[in-house]
Amino acid sequence: MGFAEKFIASLSSRNLRNDAFHHDLDVIAAAALAGDMGALLCRVKYADGTISRLFEGNAGNLAQLLRAWTAAVAKKGQARRWVKATTAWDAQAANTLYRRVAEASLAHWLDSKCKVCHGTGVVSASEAGAPLVCQACHGAGEAAISCSGGFELERIKDMVSELEAIFQSHGARAMRRLGR
């Protein structure tokens, strides 16, 4: 069982005791102690109920994550020289690009499931009755990233992989804290 599965299982625990026999909250404690951005990603994606749920989660965590991620994307964009900002207009365009990339990459990472097949990769055929490969995602179960152009799309894909790397390293640090 991976870190995400253990974290989700800990969230639904009915036993809040923490003694020699009950260890349900250890994963949540390890997640909190393992880091800042990864812990926030974990909280927003799995604990706040913002993904495909009918209730509102903690919008403050999502807003905090969006601010932190936008600042991180701007820093990465400047370091990687995505846009040469020589004039005030260039700086404004660069900031707009950083914000759009941050918002789109975070939205895709938080909920990348195909809306047509709900992430399964197959849809039921009404006439034949047999399942068919989803045409929207071509059976992958992951929705395509929608944006205006190729330049922006490549930056969004790059930042989605950065988010996944942050989350994976956070999970590894948390599992080390658990001693497993």
What positions do the PLM features span?
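N-terminal alpha-helical interaction blocks
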Residues: 1-100
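Short, flexible, mixed-charge glycine/proline-rich loop motifs
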Residues: 100-113, 121-129
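The −1 position to Zn-ligating cysteines in a subset of zinc-ribbon hairpins
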Residues: 113-116, 133-136
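Cys/His-coordinated zinc-binding microdomains
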Residues: 118-121, 138-141
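Long, charge-rich boundary regions
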Residues: 142-180
